[in-house]
């Protein structure tokens, strides 16, 4: 959430000349409604069910870059599918930087809170250990420009696939 998954993912896919997929966008395209609407009518659990089905579909595709929503890591099946079918990059970013990047974004249901900073910190506390346990590579997107992040990922990916 706000770490740069879509921005970095698109640039990475372009550099690798492979298709880019965003699981949240794919869910919106398949349902015809946006993520906040899914949360409103189905709740987070309903959204997570849809997300898991989409991850099952997308991880069957070869030679793609996939950006997932930040909560995809919460379900064990998603973690298994991602680890078995890809090179996982954790785009790490500080709470303050994420808050700065998302403060005007109205399309993030989990940040609709009286105190968004507290909410982000709570999400980090719930998820960070899962991100770290799944990651093949970790890069801090809060301290580098996106092009430098992409180059760093490319170097690591190429060395891991020799």
Question: Which sequence ranges carry the predicted segments?
Answer:
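Walker A (P-loop) phosphate-binding loop of P-loop NTPases
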Residues: 2
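Walker A/P-loop
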Residues: 6
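ATP-dependent small-molecule kinase phosphotransfer cores
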Residues: 22-72, 76-83, 108-109, 121, ...
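A glycine- and Lys/Arg-enriched "phosphate-lid" helix/loop adjacent to the NTP-binding pocket
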Residues: 84-128
